[in-house]
Structure formats: C-alpha cells, structure tokens
Amino acid sequence: MKIGGWQRFSLIDYPDRIGAVVFTQGCNFRCPYCHNPELVDPRRFGKTIPPGDIISFLAGRRGKLDAVTITGGEPTRQGDLADFLTRVKELGFLVKLDTNGSAPFTLAMLLEKGLVDYIAMDIKGPLEKYAAIAGTEVNGRDIVTSVSLISGAGIPHEFRTTLVAPFITPEDVVTTAGLIPAESRYVLQRFVPAKLLASGLGEINCFTDIVIAALKVRLEKHLSCVAVR
C-alpha cells in the first residue's frame, strides 16, 4: 500500500462525519488539470508513509474520529487496498472511497466484502471525451459498469464532475448526467486553479456562477439530487 500523504482531521471529506484522509500514491489517469500532481506523476512522488503508522494513529483515535476517506491518486490501483481497509474497519471506522471508476472488478470485490460505506466516483465527462480529459485511453464499459455497481450497492454514494473549461462544456455535463441513475446524488465541482499536473495549458477556468446555477436547474429536472461544491 503506497501512501503518499494523510490528513489527521477533516470535517468535509466524509459527509456529516469527523474523519481522517489517506492519500494513495499513483494513478492510471493523467488529467491535465489534476490538483494532486505529487500523487500522480512518479517524478514528483515523495516518501511514502508506512500503513502501520496510519493504523496505529487510528487505533488511538477511536471514539474521536468516525471515518476514514481513502483518496489519491487512484486507490483501486493498490493491490493490498482490501487488506488495509479490513484493518481500518476492524477498528470500527466508516470508510469512504474516492475513485475514478476504472476498476469495476476491484469495486465489486470491496463491496462484496463490505469494506466500503460511502463511494464518491469522479465521472470526467461524456464517454467519447474521456481520452482527452483523462489524458489516456479509458475503457468506457468500465466506467458504465462502475456507475451501475455503485448506484446499485445500497450504500450512500455520489458521482462528481469537475467543471473545467475548455475540457468540458455545459452540454457535456448534461450528457454526462445521463450516465447517472435519477436517484443518485450528482455533484458539480468547481475547478479551482492551483497546482496542476500539466503545464502550458493556456487559459482554463471554472464555469461562471451563472452558468453553474442554470446548469443545476436544468439537471434537477432529471436527477433527484444535484449539489454544487
């Protein structure tokens, strides 16, 4: 388990819970606007943190923390993810998994073992634009399968799309929302310009507040829960 960083306290990562956050190292996507390049680009990797250090910390925080969010990078790339989550669950913590949905077989295994209590999946955009947005070829069937697994798992979940122009347009978001069941929560994430994976991207921006508000109203005609973050 390659852990590139962690946050001992968070009020925002697991909805309505006090938690810690674990950042795994490594990702199979290369989204140019990624804000965690040190977890994606091997040339920027730092020293890893022993999983045992995290487990020891969590053991001492029982009764004070409720949950642990596993994010990245892409956590499902970690071969021993299930073993780590088992140890976290044995300590009595809820587990939230952030994923890009590219590994449905891993998701199915984690769900079958009851190792995840909440899943947040990033849907980058329409399937036909995935390669351009993710910076690599992506199997669209894997994305669709992951959406189906997550939405049918019977646990709290959300799907998220980052609103970053020119990689994605408002019409692209509407198309993307069509991949999501009406009863699932869909989160429109504002893009915040900061450190990026790629350089020389030119002008990239979040949608304006007016565009986001209009988009939310439009999506709410088809989805039961649309949030802006």
Regions found by a protein language model. Give the residues of each.
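SEC14/CRAL-TRIO lipid-binding/transfer domains and related phosphoinositide-recognition modules
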Residues: 2-7, 26, 52-53
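Canonical Radical SAM [4Fe-4S] cluster-binding loop centered on the CxxxCxxC motif
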Residues: 16-49
